[in-house]
């Protein structure tokens, strides 16, 4: 499957040119934003780690080996890309133990920048945001048009699609999910099961969002919508009054789409009709998610791009700096600007 089939239409028209992303790790930098002050004592050693050419799980394994502990005692807030320069937190549970010598874990691909003790382990999804610095190289495009589109995006946001990396190479993860769903089976391995269930939910969400981008309603509240704030997992129904809430205009409040689970869509009106129609069209995937015990959740349809700035350090390089909530994909911003020339892979996303 191609990108258009896995995601959906762009919000602002065709790509404005071509560029390469991830020609080097420095072209895709991610800094985890964590608003948790460390207590200075406790059985958990927290580590601020810079890594390149390593995904999060590989880094965790290396830290576990160096510390002489089992992998399950190493925790992290979210998964970060392999083909990137990333800085994120890890914690290691060390009850009654001194800080281990972790020099064996460090080399040109992994450096521990700072450390500290805390009373609790690092929980999945505990980070507040991810900060990105992207360099689009080999740029071919009209800078004036790119600047205008970036200004529009800064004011209006972008569709909050799950990026193609969620679906694997050419949508292979979705093919696997369909195979298991068709057999009414679940993978035995927990990691594989989680990956394929997430893929199926993401695809159903993207289909709903694609339909709303196509009809122009992705950033507008309509009666029957379920609304949510940018950083909240809770939601509430939209009536006539809520549809004119001024917080919609300033990108604090957004319509949401389904993360499918048990029961019909909790939305109402035209929103429920659309979501249930897509779920019925993909009934094999929907029923598979329900049998797996997934709970119905919501995800904002519109993604505000925090602190968006850009400049051109070289005539053929566009550098973007911005902040996204956890679970959102930097590559969907790039997609609204340019087509990518194949260079590096967008491996594993920031999914938590």
UniProtKB/Swiss-Prot annotation:
Function (record text): Responsible for synthesis of pseudouridine from uracil-13 in transfer RNAs.
Active site: 81 (nucleophile)
SUPFAM superfamilies xref list: Pseudouridine synthase
Similarity comment text for this entry: Belongs to the pseudouridine synthase TruD family.
Enzyme Commission designation: 5.4.99.27
PROSITE patterns: TRUD (PS50984), UPF0024 (PS01268)
Cellular component, GO annotation: cytosol
Keyword hit for tRNA processing: yes
Gene name in the database record: truD
Domain TRUD: from-to ranges: 157-303
Keywords for the protein's UniProt record, in alphabetical order: Isomerase, tRNA processing
Catalytic activity: uridine(13) in tRNA = pseudouridine(13) in tRNA
Keyword flag tRNA processing: yes
GO MF terms, alphabetically ordered: RNA binding; tRNA pseudouridine(13) synthase activity
Top-level EC class as recorded in UniProt: isomerase
Biological process (GO), any one: tRNA pseudouridine synthesis
Listed InterPro entries: PsdUridine_synth_cat_dom_sf, PsdUridine_synth_TruD, PsdUridine_synth_TruD_CS, PsdUridine_synth_TruD_insert, TruD_catalytic, TruD_insert_sf, TruD_pseudoU_synthase
Protein's recorded name: tRNA pseudouridine synthase D
């Amino acid at each position: 499957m191609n990108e258009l089939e896995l995601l959906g239409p762009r919000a602002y028209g065709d790509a404005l040119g071509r560029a390469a992303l991830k020609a080097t790790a420095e072209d895709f930098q991610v800094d985890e934003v964590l608003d948790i002050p460390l207590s200075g004592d406790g059985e958990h050693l927290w580590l601020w780690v810079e890594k390149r050419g390593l995904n999060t799980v590989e880094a965790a394994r290396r830290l576990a080996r160096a510390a002489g502990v089992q992998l399950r005692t190493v925790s992290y807030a979210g998964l970060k890309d392999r083909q990137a320069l990333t800085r994120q937190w890890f914690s290691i549970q060390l009850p009654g133990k001194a800080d281990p010598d972790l020099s064996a874990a460090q080399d040109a691909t992994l450096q521990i920048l700072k450390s500290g003790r805390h009373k609790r382990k690092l929980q999945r999804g505990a980070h507040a945001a991810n900060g990105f610095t992207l360099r689009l190289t080999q740029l071919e495009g009209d800078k004036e048009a790119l600047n205008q589109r970036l200004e529009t995006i800064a004011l209006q946001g972008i569709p909050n699609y799950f990026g193609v990396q969620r679906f694997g190479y050419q949508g292979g993860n979705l093919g696997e999910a369909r195979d298991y769903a068709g057999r009414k089976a679940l993978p035995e391995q927990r990691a594989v099961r989680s990956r394929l269930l997430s893929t199926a939910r993401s695809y159903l969400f993207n289909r709903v969002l694609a339909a709303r981008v196509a009809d122009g309603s992705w950033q507008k509240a309509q009666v029957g919508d379920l609304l949510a704030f940018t950083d909240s997992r809770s939601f509430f129904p939209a009536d006539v009054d809520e549809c004119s809430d001024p917080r919609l205009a300033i990108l604090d409040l957004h319509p949401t789409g389904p993360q499918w689970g048990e029961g019909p869509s909790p939305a109402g009106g035209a929103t429920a009709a659309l979501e249930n129609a897509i779920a019925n069209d993909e009934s094999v995937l929907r029923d598979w998610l329900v049998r797996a015990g997934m709970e119905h959740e919501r995800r904002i349809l519109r993604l505000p791009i925090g602190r968006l700035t850009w400049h051109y350090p070289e005539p053929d390089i566009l550098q973007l700096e911005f902040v996204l909530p956890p679970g959102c994909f930097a590559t969907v911003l790039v997609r609204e600007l340019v087509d990518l020339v194949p260079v590096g892979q967008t491996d594993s996303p920031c999914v938590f």
